[in-house]
Amino acid sequence: MDTAELTRLADCPAPAKLNLFLHVIGRRPDGYHLLQTAFRLLDWGDALSFELRHDGVVARATDLPGVSAEHDLVVRAARLLQSYTGCRLGADIRVDKRLPMGGGLGGGSSDAATTLIALNRLWRTGVRGEELTALGLRLGADVPFFIFGRDAFAEGVGDELRPLDLPPAWYVVVAPPVTVPTVEIFAAGELTRDTEPIKITDFAASTTRNDLQAVACSRYPEIGAAIDWLAQFAPARMTGSGACVFAQVASEDDAERIVASCPGSYRAWKARSVMQHPLRGWVG
């Protein structure tokens, strides 16, 4: 379709991510943490729709509970693209929110990345991939990964990305009944920030960990309980700063069986890895 004809982009995927491991290896003078992590994309996530406006207004067609428009990453992403390009067009944005908030699955960051990618297309602003990635970093450390659009080994504050070739896999993701503020975990005095850096060739789930997990579990025991429950079936750990935990399983049948046995106090989903972001072809 000629982009000149576009007035609407519907059901644009904003996939979840897993941190297969997450090491905190230092802290910059400006307070940002230096990380090493392996990002993995999943076939499960939010979906966003964008309707072109000619009055320059960016409006949410759906509210996000507890989040004002000024603090909504989707709205901020749209306005950032407007400001950066001088675009006078606007958009009505609808978010079908499927990922749990405060879960460590990158939902807000993924929504922001999809907004930048989709509106760059809808508005025909012509921002190239590297510039779009730099804009994403201004919104959050995880946003560049979703614009990068494939499994990655990440360093720096999460913005130094290298492709990571991983075999396909099935996962079970479990959400305990808590929401974890990322800032709280990274600001914790007990968080260790001196893990020895590893090389990309050394990456293996058996020799890595999530440095944020112990802090999150001490403050939110429900996370530790969810890990213990899931670990009955396969090695389990937390993703991101929590609260969701995950385990890799052998097959879709195994994933479905575990999800079906999930206690009522938790929510559980099956998810499959994907080779690349569904919108990667839109990033120039």
From Swiss-Prot:
Matching Gene3D superfamilies: 3.30.230.10, GHMP kinase, C-terminal domain (3.30.70.890)
Catalyzed reactions: 4-CDP-2-C-methyl-D-erythritol + ATP = 4-CDP-2-C-methyl-D-erythritol 2-phosphate + ADP + H(+)
A GO term, aspect molecular function: ATP binding
Alphabetical keyword list: ATP-binding, Isoprene biosynthesis, Kinase, Nucleotide-binding, Transferase
GO biological process, one term: terpenoid biosynthetic process
SUPFAM superfamilies named in the record: GHMP Kinase, C-terminal domain, Ribosomal protein S5 domain 2-like
Broad class of enzyme this protein falls into: transferase
Highest taxon in the source lineage: Bacteria
Record: residues binding ATP: 100-110
EC annotation from Swiss-Prot or TrEMBL: 2.7.1.148
Active site: 17, 142
Pathway: Isoprenoid biosynthesis; isopentenyl diphosphate biosynthesis via DXP pathway; isopentenyl diphosphate from 1-deoxy-D-xylulose 5-phosphate: step 3/6
Entry function: Catalyzes the phosphorylation of the position 2 hydroxy group of 4-diphosphocytidyl-2C-methyl-D-erythritol.
HAMAP family: IspE
Family the entry assigns: Belongs to the GHMP kinase family. IspE subfamily.
Protein name: 4-diphosphocytidyl-2-C-methyl-D-erythritol kinase
Phylogenetic placement of the source organism: Bacteria, Pseudomonadati, Pseudomonadota, Betaproteobacteria, Rhodocyclales
Recorded name of the encoding gene: ispE
